[in-house]
Structures are given as C-alpha cells and as structure tokens.
A protein has these predicted regions:
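Acidic, glycine-enriched active-site microenvironments
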Residues: 61
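N-terminal intrinsically disordered, cationic/polar leader segments
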Residues: 1-52, 56, 67-89
Length: 89
C-alpha cells in the first residue's frame, strides 16, 4: 500500500465513522449548518433515519466494540434522541 492509503486507513475507524453520522444527524436536526448551503435546516425524516442507523449499528456490533467505542455510541445516541424528541414535541 502507498503511504497515502496507509494514512487514510489509520484515519478511518469505527469512532470516526460514528462521529460522521453524528455530524450528519446534527445537520438534519438543525444544530449545524448544511455544509453545502451553509444554512441551518431541520429535516426530521433524515434525522430519524440517521439515528435509526446508529441504533442498528449499536445492535449489530454489540459485544464487538471497545469500551470507548461503546460509550461514544451510547452517548451520541442519547444526545441525538433528546434533541429529536424536543423537536417533534
């Protein structure tokens, strides 16, 4: 492998993947601006889809995560669900 591919491989971890999904969910919840439009917009359908995807990953990876990865995923899901519920009420 080239040095560039090795560096990229080291950057791609389960935690960085989960954090990227978290960022996407925060954009859909209107917490962060859309990177294309630079505007904050709420899209509850996409937010729920992203939260459901994270929940599915939690179930599918159960028993295979490090303690830190598991805590990160639990924390992210908790925070996203709270924000989602506040918006739908």
């Amino acid at each position: 492998m080239s040095k560039e591919k090795d560096e990229l491989k080291n950057l791609i971890t389960f935690s960085t993947f989960i954090l990227s999904l978290n960022t996407a969910a925060l954009v859909h919840l209107g917490e962060l601006p859309d990177p294309v439009t630079n505007k904050k917009q709420v899209n509850l359908t996409l937010a729920k889809h992203t939260i459901d995807t994270l929940e599915m990953l939690k179930e599918k990876t159960k028993g295979n995560l490090t303690f830190e990865e598991e805590k990160l995923l639990q924390s992210i899901l908790y925070e996203l669900k709270l924000k989602y519920v506040k918006l739908i009420d």
